[in-house]
Amino acid sequence: MESSLCKKSLMKRRRALRVRKVLKGSPTKPRLSVVKTNKHIYVQLIDDSIGKTLASVSTLSKLNKSQGLTKKNQEVAKVLGTQIAELGKNLQLDRVVFDRGPFKYHGIVSMVADGAREGGLQF
């Protein structure tokens, strides 16, 4: 019998793989990946054809630390969404594929998506 912690992490990994098997990022339409931990939020634009991160923002970045955006809440998530949209526009990207990973499209994940849409990204 496996521990509940091992089972929980295994199920989380399976959910992420289930979502990602249908999502592929390309140079013209990268994958917008959202990862949240117990303390922080990470948002990345990823080109899966070459396996490279094109742009990223998080609650750990210097810009957000100087502005006091270090907490993990919905307001900060929306700001991160608008920041990643600005970085995407600097790279001449306007369309992305949204990757929620193993998380429900609810709360922080949906606020990142709303912020990115308000910033001009389409998905």
Swiss-Prot record:
One of its GO terms (cellular component) is cytosolic large ribosomal subunit. InterPro entries: Ribosomal_uL18_bac-type, Ribosomal_uL18_bac/euk. Transmembrane segments: none annotated. Keywords: Ribonucleoprotein, Ribosomal protein, RNA-binding, rRNA-binding. Disulfide bonds: none annotated. It holds the Pfam family Ribosomal_L18p. One of its GO terms (biological process) is translation. GO terms for molecular function: 5S rRNA binding; structural constituent of ribosome. Belongs to the universal ribosomal protein uL18 family. HAMAP family: Ribosomal_uL18_B (MF_01337_B). PANTHER family: 39S RIBOSOMAL PROTEIN L18, MITOCHONDRIAL (PTHR12899), LARGE RIBOSOMAL SUBUNIT PROTEIN UL18M (PTHR12899:SF3). This is one of the proteins that bind and probably mediate the attachment of the 5S RNA into the large ribosomal subunit, where it forms part of the central protuberance. Part of the 50S ribosomal subunit; part of the 5S rRNA/L5/L18/L25 subcomplex. Contacts the 5S and 23S rRNAs. This is Large ribosomal subunit protein uL18. It comes from Chlamydia pneumoniae. The lineage of its organism: Bacteria, Pseudomonadati, Chlamydiota, Chlamydiia, Chlamydiales.
